[in-house]
Amino acid sequence: MLHTIVNCPTCAKQVIWDPVSKYRPFCSERCQLIDLGEWANEEKRIASVEDEAMHYTFENND
């Protein structure tokens, strides 16, 4: 049986994408919590069209 292998988004360790991998796509609870903390601290965000438009406006107001 072939398994899909992904890299943990936090530490890049290889993880089997399977229900047996409890924290997938993370390799461990630690990496999962590090990622959650980054989202909570607003170090990560999903870009939107509005974000890009605001960036363009601010750049051109110099």
Swiss-Prot record:
Classification from the root reads: Bacteria, Pseudomonadati, Pseudomonadota, Gammaproteobacteria, Pasteurellales
Q: How is the cofactor bound, as the UniProt entry phrases it?
A: Binds 1 zinc ion.
Residue numbers binding Zn(2+): C8, C11, C27, C31
Q: Which domain of life is it from?
A: Bacteria
The protein's name: DNA gyrase inhibitor YacG
Query: Key word Transport present in the record?
Result: no
Q: Name one GO biological process term.
A: regulation of DNA-templated transcription
Function comment: Inhibits all the catalytic activities of DNA gyrase by preventing its interaction with DNA. Acts by binding directly to the C-terminal domain of GyrB, which probably disrupts DNA binding by the gyrase.
SUBUNIT field: Interacts with GyrB.
| UniProt KW Transferase keyword | no
* Gene Ontology MF, one: DNA topoisomerase type II (double strand cut, ATP-hydrolyzing) inhibitor activity
Cofactor(s) demanded:
Zn(2+)
The protein's matches in InterPro entries, at most eight in alphabetical order, are given as: DNA_gyrase_inhibitor_YacG, Znf_NHR/GATA
Organism of origin: Haemophilus ducreyi (strain 35000HP / ATCC 700724)
What's the short name of a Pfam family annotated to this entry?
Answer: YacG
The gene coding this protein: yacG
Family membership noted in the UniProt record? Belongs to the DNA gyrase inhibitor YacG family.
Record's keyword terms, sorted: Metal-binding, Zinc
Name which cysteines form disulfide bonds: none
